[in-house]
């Protein structure tokens, strides 16, 4: 039996739809973001150094993205409680390149079933 492999959506293609639990409550993607640009970005794991610095940078730039009518949505296959603990650690304990006490206010999707990651071609079959 051949396994279906999803590829990353290309510019101009319809974004795969999903509902998901996030650190900011449930989202219905992409319907909740109608009329806005969205950057849906993923990271391999919470509490990793590069992912932490990337999240801190995105969070400090969120106002600029909002001014450009662009929303940020993060995704990983970690669970919600891991996400919450990681974001709390970023805010309370991490300092990087002059950034500290950084609060991440954009949603971070819990995807422990890998459903969303697979829809977006982010996982190997």
Q: Can you annotate each of these PLM segments?
A:
Residues 1-125:
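Chalcogenol-based redox active-site neighborhoods
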């Amino acid at each position: 039996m051949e396994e279906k492999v999803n590829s990353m959506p290309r510019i101009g293609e319809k974004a795969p739809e999903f509902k998901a639990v996030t650190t900011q409550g449930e989202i219905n993607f992409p319907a909740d973001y109608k009329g806005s640009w969205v950057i849906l970005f993923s990271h391999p794991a919470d509490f990793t150094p590069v992912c932490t610095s990337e999240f801190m940078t995105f969070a400090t730039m969120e106002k600029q993205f909002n001014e450009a009518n662009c929303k940020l949505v993060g995704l990983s296959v970690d669970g919600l409680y891991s996400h919450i603990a990681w974001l709390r650690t970023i805010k309370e304990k991490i300092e990087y390149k002059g950034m500290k006490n950084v609060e991440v206010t954009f949603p971070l999707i819990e995807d422990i079933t890998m459903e969303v990651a697979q829809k977006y071609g982010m996982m190997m079959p």
